[in-house]
């Protein structure tokens, strides 16, 4: 039976790569390397769009977004924080051609889909100790969605710091805290309220969505509501908090 052209090409590529590995140090090694690279190209934009719109990709995207929105809703409902803004960026990247040197791993997959989500809240700066402690109390009752609780020693010291019961939580001279962080968990940041001058850390505005950033299913960028800013939350409530989720690689197709 006559082999199809694709089968012949795949076999010739395998043979060429095997020869290349043996001859890499020979004078013809570089030429063979360049020829082999042509056998393993990056994922085309057409293929990226097709895979991004597949049933499996759509399901994975909906599940990842739903899980993070559920966590945000729990923070809004059970902590002293008031939700004001949610930003989401959803991007699909095609894999690269074979990386023979300085490999990054981007040549191992056809497509990788990643989601970036941050929620912004408002709170009263005059009651920040109660706010931090209220978050920990909510985490005691619902650790699956609010990972900070009273078992987190540093977080309890932060609450005591704002009550004036202890010094700088990270040690003498380290100054006012502005973050709670646990590996693989969302990171909580807030405006510093005791620090004045140029050294004061404030929650930054999210990056705007460029016009070209909305091209479903390949790219999505959302600001909900679009008219709200961090500075507006600060004016309304007195201070701002942000809850930033780790980058979620929710759909990957390997080569």
Q: Language model features by range: what are they?
A:
Residues 83-105:
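Short, solvent-exposed beta-alpha or beta-beta edge segments that form flexible loop/patches at the rim
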Residues 47-59, 99-144, 156:
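Terminal, regulation- and interaction-focused segments at domain boundaries
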Residues 39-88, 142-255:
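An acidic-aromatic pocket/loop used at catalytic or ligand-binding sites
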Residues 25, 99, 103, 227-229:
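Residue-level detector of functional hotspots within protein domains
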Residues 3, 9, 17, 46, ...:
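Context-gated lysine
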Residues 1-37:
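Sec-dependent bacterial lipoprotein signal peptides
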